[in-house]
Amino acid sequence: MRAYNDLIVALKQCGALAVCDGFYVIGADEQAFTRNLVGDIYNLTAVNAPTYAADNYVAGNGTTSYYDTGANPTTMVSPKFVQDSAHLGIWSLTNNNNAGALSYDAGNANTFIARTAATSGGVTFRVNRTGSALATLPGYPGHIVVSRSASDLFKIWGNGTDIGGATTASTGVSNQTLRISDASGSLHGVNQIRAMHFGSHMTLAQAAAVNAALRAYASAIGAP
């Protein structure tokens, strides 16, 4: 419990929790993972029994299982996640792919983080747009954040560093809930995920602080 509380304190102190609509992290049981650290809203629902490994990770089966936040950007009340200020972040433990295809680790149709099969550490991502961009995260697996700060600018932060971005314009939020191990209900994931968060634009400094806080938490709970 102390490690959990220390994590929340660290996330508040760096300002990261204030920009989030949802923040989820692995714990001793699945119920702890499904609780939103931001508040009692958008708690996760397990769909078709995704894998839950206590104090370690969750994973989809690549076909039907995932966690649903219930947060639809078009219907959320006073959302921080909006068209031209939005982020999605995950902490992934694996560098594998979905049988040679993409592993969609989190998101929905217009905002997602997926793992490419072509390159070790390769990431395919988008933030409130219909086209995707590519980046490579040295030292992957790890913590990755895709964040849009303007209508014509979005960046990708990897393990607390700047690893790329694009100037492609936003096209709108998706009328779909944000999910873990899935994006849009037909794009599925298999990788091991230890944390996921989403909200308004997250700065590089905040992403670096989240990365450090998550790693300190994992060490404190004895995560493998």
How should each PLM-predicted stretch be described?
Residues M1-P224:
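Polar, enzyme-active/binding microenvironments
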